[in-house]
Amino acid sequence: MQLYTYLYLLVPLVTFHLILGTGTLDHGGALTERRSTDAIALKPEPVLLQKSSARSTDDNGNDRLTQMKRILKKRGNKARGEEEVAKMAAELAREDAVNGK
């Protein structure tokens, strides 16, 4: 009978402690505040990329985007189109066939 008396007194105390410990009844209805805080905490932060990490580099460690800009500036911004590249590849293939490579 003594065990039931202790449990009768202990269970409400433990329950009340757990409720206050989780913050569901703390400050009068903090359950919604806590959920919104958790939602904000779980929201991913934006990734801020630095220029050096966002751009790829070649084998020499040079920035490819910067190199391409320099090349285009030297050409006078006359970038080769796909047709010009295809013609150049066909000419190189013919030269290789003629030279016996």
Swiss-Prot record:
Localization of this protein: Secreted
InterPro entries: Conantokin_CS
Main location group: secreted
Presence of the UniProt keyword Calcium in the record: yes
Regions that span the bilayer: none
Asparagine amide PTM positions: N99
Binding site for a divalent metal cation: E91, E95
Entry comment describing in which tissues the protein is expressed: Expressed by the venom duct.
Propeptide regions on this chain: 22-80
Domain of life: Eukaryota
Pfam families: Toxin_36
Post-translational modification 4-carboxyglutamate, affected residues: E83, E84, E91, E95
Cofactor dependency: Ca(2+); Mg(2+)
Signal peptide: 1-21
One annotated Gene Ontology cellular component of this protein: host cell postsynaptic membrane
Cofactor remark: Divalent cations stabilize the toxin the in alpha-helix conformation.
Family: Belongs to the conotoxin B superfamily.
Additional free-text comment from the UniProt record: The mature peptide does not contain cysteine residue. Stabilized by divalent cations. Calcium or magnesium.
Task performed by this protein: Conantokins inhibit N-methyl-D-aspartate (NMDA) receptors. This toxin is far less potent as an anticonvulsant compound than conantokin-R. It induces sleep-like symptoms in mice.
Listed name of the protein: Conantokin-L
